């Protein structure tokens, strides 16, 4: 019987492995429920049950544990923010808040199900990402984050610092109480042309890099997800200093292939290859088209330090047989 932990250990060490593994994940509840685990216990239970069902059906090579239900940050979720100055009302909630304690219990219950069989990574959003997601997913305002950020960068940076301080504790405590292998950190550039490189270096990098430093203190194997999809794009140059060991970006959205990205990120381990948008190859292609694509993908990118995955989260409706096929093709075309 295949030892998936040994397989992924080789891959995460950028070594030649018997096959190219796969890594796909999806959400378990609606966007608004992403923020509601503490007020509705059924949300948390659906996410826990969903992970267990996903593991049983998909038999993944490793697991990214979704933070569905714990998106955002309690102070953001419970503070009326209409103008940039309101961001100064965002405060750290501290180590005893239910958002800390219940989230750790939630991760542990999921993780204990399969951590002895596969590598596990817990999803953490960068401090600024926590704010953006609440405005966009819960309030439905896709322009608010950039508008307030550009209106008063210091106020947004202050709010992000409050969240970063809580994330430091959460991450450290997760590794003390849960047998996690690493963190999957989701980051994104500010979606506004006025937020240039110097803006990111002054207002985005400090809290992002603080979170990364905390993550690296806890584990050597972590995944950086540069979140792009649809109209959300990223300049990969903004993330050159984000020194985590495995990189996942939107190869299709950013028009940067696995081979190009692996070279750009100094030969780090990379995850990706498939567009995650609906009615694309992953969900709509034939088996023959999938095989031709993977053959071409691996001939181009190579098979050392490569994991076949997608730009971002995928639809939960894709039949599990598709992932079984991709896994077999990763073995067939391993050089």
Explain the meaning of each model-derived region.
Residues 34-38, 73-82:
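Glycine-rich loop at the start of a catalytic domain that most often binds anionic cofactors/ligands
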Residues 48-72:
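Membrane helical hairpin/interfacial module
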Residues 1-29, 33-38, 50, 61-65, ...:
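Active-site loop segments of alpha/beta catalytic cores
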Residues 41-45, 49:
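N-terminal beta1-alpha1-beta2 module of alpha/beta enzyme domains
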Residues 83-91:
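Active-site gating loops and adjacent loop-to-helix segments of metal-dependent hydrolytic enzymes
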């Amino acid at each position: 019987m295949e030892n998936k932990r040994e397989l992924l250990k080789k891959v995460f060490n950028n070594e030649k492995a018997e096959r190219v593994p796969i890594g796909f994940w999806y959400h378990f509840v609606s966007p608004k429920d992403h923020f509601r685990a503490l007020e509705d216990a059924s949300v948390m239970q659906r996410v826990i049950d969903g992970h267990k069902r996903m593991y049983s059906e998909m038999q993944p090579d490793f697991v990214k544990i979704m933070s569905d239900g714990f998106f955002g940050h309690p102070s953001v979720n419970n503070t009326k923010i209409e103008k940039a100055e309101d961001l100064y009302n965002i405060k750290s909630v501290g180590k005893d808040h239910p958002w800390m304690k219940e989230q750790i219990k939630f991760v542990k219950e999921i993780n204990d199900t399969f951590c002895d069989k596969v590598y596990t990574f817990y999803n953490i959003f960068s401090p600024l990402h926590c704010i953006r997601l609440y405005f966009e997913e819960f309030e439905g305002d896709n322009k608010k984050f950039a508008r307030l950020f550009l209106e008063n960068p210091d106020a947004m940076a202050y709010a992000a610092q409050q969240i970063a301080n809580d994330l430091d504790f959460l991450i450290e405590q997760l590794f003390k109480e849960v047998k996690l292998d690493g963190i999957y950190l989701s980051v994104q550039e500010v979606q506004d042309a006025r937020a240039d490189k110097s803006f990111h270096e002054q207002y985005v990098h400090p809290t992002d890099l603080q979170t990364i430093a905390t993550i690296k203190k806890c584990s050597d194997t972590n995944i950086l997800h540069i979140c792009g999809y649809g109209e959300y794009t990223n300049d990969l140059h903004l993330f050159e200093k984000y020194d985590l060991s495995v990189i996942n970006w939107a190869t299709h959205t950013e028009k940067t292939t696995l081979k190009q990205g692996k070279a750009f990120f100094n030969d780090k381990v990379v995850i990706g290859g498939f567009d995650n948008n609906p009615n694309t190859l992953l969900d709509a292609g034939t088996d023959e088209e999938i095989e031709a694509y993977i053959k071409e993908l691996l001939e181009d990118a190579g098979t050392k330090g490569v994991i076949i995955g997608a730009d971002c989260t995928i639809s939960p409706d894709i039949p599990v047989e598709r992932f079984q096929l991709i896994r077999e093709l990763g073995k067939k075309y391993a050089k």
